[in-house]
Amino acid sequence: MLSRLLSGYASVEGRYDELLSAPGIPRPHWDAFLRSLAARQGLEVSETLALMESEMRENGITYNVYADPKGADRPWEVDPLPLLLSATEWDEIAAGIAQRADLLNRVLGDIYGPQELLRSGAIPPSIIFGHSGYLHQVQGIRPPGGVHLFNYAADLARSPDGHWWVVNDRTQAPSGSGYALENRLVVSRVFPQMFRDLHVQHLASFFDALRESLLRWAPKDVVDRASERANPLVVLLTPGPYNETYFEHALLARYLGFPLVEGSDLTVRDGCVWMKTVEGLKRVNAILRRQDDDYCD
């Protein structure tokens, strides 16, 4: 059955083949998935794909496309054939991305701090000071824990010899985590047995770490008088419903348990940010922004 499934598949010369290690031979981490897929009847596969599309529509998953003549809200689509990576390969990717994020955070800390990289000539000052993204207003600001780059993502591509390349850094308000979460939820409902058998690494630990980091870096002197325990208020700042990833903003706010706010929902008084509510102003202790930094004000 597996040979029939792969009968029409052909590798492209000069490209890395994610699926096969040799003609007709799946890579080890693909084998179980392909055998499970091959065991399904054609009608069953069609019904499964239809169920997946139905789940997406019912959940209202959209991606807003600016200036799209078909309308702003475009339904989100999930490729039924996933990209499978072995645990070993993913660990290598994760370590490399973490190292790159740490480097970029240190560079930001120096540029907005002592500027030793500029003084030494390692980075020409004209590149920094002439860049539209450099914000003179925040020069000298020291964020909690020295974390200038709180959230980071990278666009990856596979090289012809199988190595991974970073083709773009996402350092402003990287999107994708919410869509990845929704994809996982839909796929786990549509392919429950296959999802369990493949031992897919869960995403919950990432979102738990994100939530805990925001709460940890929030001021410690905020106390909820009712419970007499630290209870910082964290909000997720969105540009609004016309942003291309607004669905993700709403999803993340709900999943993390943070209020979703726009700029008009906030005000600044006595050097502090406050959220407007029907019960009055509530002090905000941390903001997870989903818009570019120069648009925050």
Model-derived features: where do they sit?
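Preference for protein termini
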Residues: M1-D297
